[in-house]
Amino acid sequence: MSRQHAYSREELLATARGELFSHSNARLPNDPMLMFDRITEIYADGGSHGKGIVNAELDIRPDLWFFGCHFLGDPVMPGCLGLDAMWQLTGFFLTWSGATPGYGRALGCGEVKFTGQVLPNAKLVRYEIEMTKIINRTLVIGQANARMLVDNREIYFAKDLRVGMFNSTESF
């Protein structure tokens, strides 16, 4: 299977509608919950574990929806949205790599550290996901370590992010 190694926002939104990958029913969230504007690189054999990498970016603008409500008079991007982006990208990697059809769900993570914040005057958030383990049995599970950088400064780190691909989510 020939795969792209970068994706535009339009292609990511096509994934939200179920139009990009014919082999899977996994989807990214639609706006406004899609937390990145583009995937700049995705490879199946990158990273220190040789399991693959995904790098993505979000352009920061003062008019992004979350700055208007979190918090009034003290706008900051909620930390959970950056963490969710890391799970979104881990799930996207599983679908991109040919994981069996399924619905992606975040399963947890081993450790999360926040050492900074995203303010409206920032310019760019970059996500760097490094796959550490892929289990491809009845249930497909991807595990990754991830960093989030704002204007080239690391502010979030997550270890052992886990995403599962479920044939049905009714009993989840």
Curated annotation (Swiss-Prot):
<dbReference type="InterPro" id="IPR013114">
    <property type="entry name" value="FabA_FabZ"/>
</dbReference>
<dbReference type="Pfam" id="PF07977">
    <property type="entry name" value="FabA"/>
</dbReference>
<keyword id="KW-0276">Fatty acid metabolism</keyword>
<dbReference type="InterPro" id="IPR029069">
    <property type="entry name" value="HotDog_dom_sf"/>
</dbReference>
<comment type="function">
    <text>Necessary for the introduction of cis unsaturation into fatty acids. Catalyzes the dehydration of (3R)-3-hydroxydecanoyl-ACP to E-(2)-decenoyl-ACP and then its isomerization to Z-(3)-decenoyl-ACP. Can catalyze the dehydratase reaction for beta-hydroxyacyl-ACPs with saturated chain lengths up to 16:0, being most active on intermediate chain length.</text>
</comment>
<keyword id="KW-0444">Lipid biosynthesis</keyword>
<keyword id="KW-0275">Fatty acid biosynthesis</keyword>
<comment type="similarity">
    <text>Belongs to the thioester dehydratase family. FabA subfamily.</text>
</comment>
<comment type="pathway">
    <text>Lipid metabolism; fatty acid biosynthesis.</text>
</comment>
<protein>
    <recommendedName>
        <fullName>3-hydroxydecanoyl-[acyl-carrier-protein] dehydratase</fullName>
        <ecNumber>4.2.1.59</ecNumber>
        <ecNumber>5.3.3.14</ecNumber>
    </recommendedName>
</protein>
<dbReference type="GO" id="GO:0005737">
    <property type="term" value="C:cytoplasm"/>
</dbReference>
<dbReference type="InterPro" id="IPR010083">
    <property type="entry name" value="FabA"/>
</dbReference>
<comment type="subunit">
    <text>Homodimer.</text>
</comment>
<keyword id="KW-0456">Lyase</keyword>
<keyword id="KW-0963">Cytoplasm</keyword>
<feature type="active site">
    <location>
        <position position="70"/>
    </location>
</feature>
<keyword id="KW-0443">Lipid metabolism</keyword>
<dbReference type="GO" id="GO:0019171">
    <property type="term" value="F:(3R)-hydroxyacyl-[acyl-carrier-protein] dehydratase activity"/>
</dbReference>
<dbReference type="GO" id="GO:0034017">
    <property type="term" value="F:trans-2-decenoyl-acyl-carrier-protein isomerase activity"/>
</dbReference>
<dbReference type="GO" id="GO:0006636">
    <property type="term" value="P:unsaturated fatty acid biosynthetic process"/>
</dbReference>
<keyword id="KW-0413">Isomerase</keyword>
